[in-house]
Amino acid sequence: MTNLRKSHPLIKIINHSFIDLPTPSNISAWWNFGSLLGVCLMLQIITGLFLAMHYTADTTTAFSSITHICRDVNYGWLIRYTHANGASMFFIFLYFHIGRGIYYGSYTFMETWNIGVILLFTVMATAFMGYVLPWGQMSFWGATVITNLLSAIPYIGPTLVEWIWGGFSVDKATLTRFFAFHFVLPFIITAMVMIHLLFLHETGSNNPSGLNSDSDKIPFHPYYTIKDILGLLLMLLTLMTLTLFSPDLLGDPDKYTPANPLNTPPHIKPEWYFLFAYAILRSIPNKLGGVLALVFSILILMLFPMMHMSKQRSMTFRPLSQCLLWILVANLIILTWIGGQPVEHPFITIGQLASISYFCIILILMPTTSFMENKLLKW
């Protein structure tokens, strides 16, 4: 009789994905983030489900229902702050995961990479809609500003904005539909994650050397299950420390003021994980230009496979490209800082320079450097 995990139609799929999966023997801790993102997604769905049981998607009671969750529901404060800070952890891991993909040339798995970029867009949309739900000042004005960007689309823009709002301003209809989308999108994300894994398992994992590892594979379990559990414990430690000691560290104080359409907050800004894109949006004085730059700042990831000029896959043995990538990381940190600053001198100039640098590094300097490294190696 064959082993049940190898013969049962359902368990067989799990076996091929998480147990007997042939995995390169040399993948580092940078490969932990995929599983951590999966855990984050599950955590967000579970905490979100419990929050949805007590939340009311109505402009008059939304803010009060959040207060009720934090004060009256058993461990409601814990569920609420785990959900909020869990989103921050999600984005930290997403950016690490993408950074690892760029560093080690994982984007050469075209299907996996492109599904990943679509996933990033979907997660960003979900997080934005979740930010609107507490119906504080930043929720209302954030929703107003970001949805208003669509009015920059020629011809159909203004009509599209009113259609999304369900009226002539951000109101009850907007909140209700945002709640509906925020609830359903994580399940769509889960389905897309499965497709992401399906494409990954067609090719097998990349590894730090960027070389073919078919000759040196080990089973995923127990080697990488135990390694993933270590990552999971470190993640839970960080998340719980953040949630229990300083739950509002990454948030905005304006969230605690109920939404008021007659009073604009001094600085409208999104959560920290969108600030780099927000800085790029603000650095262009033209509305349509800003929106295009915002979209392209993420969509540019789709171009990485086409712009890979090096004859080596990974950056492990390419010091010049490594330097450039770390300059890009520093540049993104500067953009994140600028996104949270008021629109005044010298922040405007710094933001514009950092935005230009961002696109120049990716579109011009990285391919040129790769080409140069090929020449240096006489290839």
Curated annotation (Swiss-Prot):
Its main location: mitochondrion. A ubiquinone binds at residue 201. Keywords: Electron transport, Heme, Iron, Membrane, Metal-binding, Mitochondrion, Mitochondrion inner membrane, Respiratory chain, Transmembrane, Transmembrane helix, Transport, Ubiquinone. Gene3D superfamilies: Cytochrome Bc1 Complex, Chain C. The chain crosses the membrane at residues 33-53, 77-98, 113-133, 178-198, 226-246, 288-308, 320-340, 347-367. Heme b b566 binds at residues 97, 196. Binds 2 heme b groups non-covalently. GO terms for molecular function: metal ion binding; ubiquinol-cytochrome-c reductase activity. GO terms for biological process: mitochondrial electron transport, ubiquinol to cytochrome c. It is a multi-pass membrane protein. It comes from the Eukaryota. InterPro entries: Cyt_b/b6_C, Cyt_b/b6_C_sf, Cyt_b/b6_N, Cytb/b6-like_sf, Cytochrome_b, Cytochrome_b_C_euk/bac, Cytochrome_b_N_euk/bac, Di-haem_cyt_TM. Its cofactor is heme b. It is found in: Mitochondrion inner membrane. Heme b b562 binds at residues 83, 182. One of its GO terms (cellular component) is respiratory chain complex III. PROSITE patterns: CYTB_CTER, CYTB_NTER. The keyword Flavoprotein does not apply. PANTHER family: CYTOCHROME B. Belongs to the cytochrome b family. Component of the ubiquinol-cytochrome c reductase complex (complex III or cytochrome b-c1 complex) that is part of the mitochondrial respiratory chain. The b-c1 complex mediates electron transfer from ubiquinol to cytochrome c. Contributes to the generation of a proton gradient across the mitochondrial membrane that is then used for ATP synthesis. Heme 1 (or BL or b562) is low-potential and absorbs at about 562 nm, and heme 2 (or BH or b566) is high-potential and absorbs at about 566 nm. The cytochrome bc1 complex contains 11 subunits: 3 respiratory subunits (MT-CYB, CYC1 and UQCRFS1), 2 core proteins (UQCRC1 and UQCRC2) and 6 low-molecular weight proteins (UQCRH/QCR6, UQCRB/QCR7, UQCRQ/QCR8, UQCR10/QCR9, UQCR11/QCR10 and a cleavage product of UQCRFS1). This cytochrome bc1 complex then forms a dimer. This is Cytochrome b. The gene is MT-CYB.
